[in-house]
């Protein structure tokens, strides 16, 4: 099962896996833990078990480019990780200082591909392809 959250966007179908930026001087592994804590409230019972080998990129549709990120970017380059969470659902708290999600759920890859915004489908398909082919 994979954690996904429904964003506080006008588009009620805006579900996604947690993600975020890498601060200056921060490693991707440190950034993923910081973002996970900020977006899910998870503080313990987790472990990074895989770092994707590829940096993934997606482009925003042209109608969103001016609305998001003040028009400064056309998309995002991302590094993805698999994190094992062995805690309880009660350890998850999306009502953080700056909440990004209004709802969350555990989901399957197929269901996630149905729920996310269409412009991220190719990205998520590529990520799932890589993690489904991990040896061991």
What kind of feature is each model-predicted range?
Residues 109-136:
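Charged phosphate-binding loop/patch that engages nucleotide di/tri-phosphates or the phosphate backbone
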Residues 1-17:
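N-terminal strand-loop-strand
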Residues 10, 37, 123-124:
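Sequence-pattern detector for short linear motifs
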Residues 13, 25, 126-127:
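A periodicity- and composition-biased signal for non-globular, repetitive helical segments
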């Amino acid at each position: 099962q994979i954690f996904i959250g429904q964003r506080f966007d006008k588009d009620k179908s805006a579900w996604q896996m947690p993600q975020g930026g890498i601060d200056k001087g921060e490693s991707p592994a440190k950034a993923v833990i910081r973002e996970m804590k900020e977006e899910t409230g998870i503080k313990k019972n987790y472990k990074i078990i895989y770092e994707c080998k590829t940096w993934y990129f997606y482009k925003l549709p042209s109608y969103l480019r001016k609305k998001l990120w003040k028009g400064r970017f056309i998309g995002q380059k991302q590094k993805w990780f698999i994190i094992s969470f062995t805690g309880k659902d009660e350890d998850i708290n999306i009502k953080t200082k700056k909440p990004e999600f209004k709802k969350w759920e555990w989901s399957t890859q197929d269901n996630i591909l149905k729920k996310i915004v269409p412009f991220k489908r190719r990205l998520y398909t590529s990520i799932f392809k890589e993690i489904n082919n991990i040896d061991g």
